[in-house]
Amino acid sequence: EEKTENGTLPIFGSFFSGRGEKLITLFYCVTFFPVTLVYGVALINALSNLLVEHLHITAISRGPLSFIVVAALYVVLSKGRDRVVAIMSALALPFAASVLLIAVSLIPGWHLSNLTDTAAEMNATPLPVTLKNIWLTLPLITFSFCCAPMVSPLSSYYRERKAEGEKKALFVIRIAYLAIFASILFFVLSCVLGIPHDNFVRAKAENLNVLSVMKGNGDFSLIYHIAPLIAIIGMTKSFLGVGLSVAQTFGQLAASVSGKKASASKRLASLALFLMTFGIVYANPDVLSLIEMFCGPLIAVILFLIPAYLIYTRPSLAELRGVTVFLVVLGGLATLSALLWTML
């Protein structure tokens, strides 16, 4: 990989130049800006739920709350990558430990019937219908396991600051994906087995995450009080992780297109992102619809299709060619086709 000045896109910046680099940078922003909206909406909803249901504070309406929170997030982003990475690093381990603790605390309340009942329903459902339902969840799955915007700044940071930075960056990426994959699977399994179905229905209806509607049982009633706080920390960390790469990339794109000073262009870009984020977060669109219609399919292009294209068009990546690449392409096309089906 060639070294580039574009630290926000260390991979794409190596294989595109000129107009191609501007287009891929724009597509990156278009892809991951909706992800920040998902986390922004989820954060405001979780915070509002905490204030109303747990602290019984109803004086703050959604408008002022959204403005204050979104403004605070963009102030943090304006401090630069090093500061955001430091904040993310400080939050990462406590947040991960808290999520795993909640997942473990749910184990005494596991009910295998939650799985067996679902399995029985699947057996009673025709196989084509079951496969179709799984297929239509691909955008959600793609979104859930994507951590590219958060891993990219971290790996770029190590690449630039450490000796043998390339090896350190690859190590960070591998460990991050392994940890995220394992923790997501365990947490989801524990929630499915330990949380009543009605809670999931309520979360979907109220546009909340599952931690905000979690209720403790017996010795674990403390979960009712700490789970919403953990959800807020998680949404904040995720917003900063994704928003960092989007803000920096959009700022650099604005500077290159406008021809103005980089500092002025970045301030204008940040202001535009802030206003759009505030407006959409205040509107409170359905989070799952955002993921299914925008985030999942666009992320599939970034994660599956563009890398496959580069592997077969760039000689430096020839060693990566093989059957695996075709499987990656199939995964991307399947995710995109799920979007097209829902639009019909």
Regions found by a protein language model. Give the residues of each.
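Hydrophobic transmembrane alpha-helices that form the core helical bundles
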Residues: 1-56, 228-253
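TM-loop-TM module centered on a large, flexible mid-protein loop between adjacent transmembrane helices
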Residues: 3-18, 177-234, 296
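Hydrophobic, small-residue-rich membrane helices and short re-entrant helix-turn-helix hairpins
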Residues: 7, 79-89, 119-122, 150-179, ...
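Helix-loop-helix connectors at the membrane interface of multi-pass transporters/channels
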Residues: 13, 41-62, 156-163, 171-179, ...
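Hydrophobic, membrane-embedded alpha-helices of multi-pass small-molecule transporters
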Residues: 28-32, 105-110, 119-191, 227-242, ...
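Selective recognition of specific alpha-helical transmembrane segments in multi-pass small-molecule
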Residues: 36, 95-105, 171-198, 271, ...
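Hydrophobic alpha-helical segments and their helix-loop junctions in multi-pass secondary transporters
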Residues: 40, 74-77, 93-125, 141-145, ...
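Membrane-interface loop-to-helix entry segments
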Residues: 43, 47, 63-109, 292-306, ...
